[in-house]
């Protein structure tokens, strides 16, 4: 919006220089909107380890929730991760499908690495297969991913089902609980500009 207004103001300047007057447009300053996050009590419910007799779908959803909370990645990114993108020895994941089109390499914490190792043992498949798949080994669609997490959240007593809310929660915890900085958060979130990241900092700091 700001870019459009700047261009329009340039047009108004031209109008004034050519004898037209009386038209002005105030500069647009977007309001800081609240980034909703999952509460600690909700996270405790969502991160509780499922029973050994749980279904593949529930176990997969549990690992997905952990992954979203520990990486801050977008839903469109997580559903495009392939088995080959997970390096458990180096404890890192490579995101090849990002909003900016740039490849990202993100560290994995030890707990998530251990749970991914167990999940991948159960999941099986080839290196080129998608990490988080359906029960038939196919790539999750965006809608299937959304519905799966919605069912998982509700079955664990959490009524909010937003996938992007996990990304906000990651940013909040990184900034507040870990004392992180905007520059590192920008790299972790894959923002193209620091201004986008500073929006999170202004809200959570």
Question: What are these model-derived regions, one by one?
Answer:
Residues 1-205:
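Conserved catalytic core of the tyrosine transesterase superfamily
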């Amino acid at each position: 919006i700001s870019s459009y207004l700047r261009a329009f103001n340039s047009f108004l300047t031209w109008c004034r220089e050519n004898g037209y007057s009386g038209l002005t447009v105030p500069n647009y300053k977007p309001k800081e909107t609240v980034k909703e996050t999952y509460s600690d009590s909700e996270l405790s419910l969502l991160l509780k380890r499922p029973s050994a007799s749980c279904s593949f779908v529930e176990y997969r959803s549990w690992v997905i929730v952990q992954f979203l909370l520990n990486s801050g990645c977008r839903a469109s990114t997580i559903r495009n991760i392939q088995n080959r993108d997970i390096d458990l020895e180096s404890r890192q994941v490579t995101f090849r499908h990002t909003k900016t089109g740039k490849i990202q390499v993100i560290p994995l914490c030890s707990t998530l690495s251990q749970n991914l190792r167990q999940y991948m043992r159960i999941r099986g498949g080839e290196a080129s297969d998608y990490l988080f798949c359906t029960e038939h080994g196919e790539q999750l669609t965006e809608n299937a991913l959304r519905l799966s997490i919605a069912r998982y959240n509700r079955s664990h007593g959490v009524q909010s089902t937003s996938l992007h809310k996990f990304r906000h929660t990651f940013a909040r915890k990184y900034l507040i609980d870990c004392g992180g900085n905007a520059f590192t958060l920008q790299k972790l979130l894959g923002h193209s500009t620091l201004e986008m990241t500073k929006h999170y900092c202004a809200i959570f700091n």
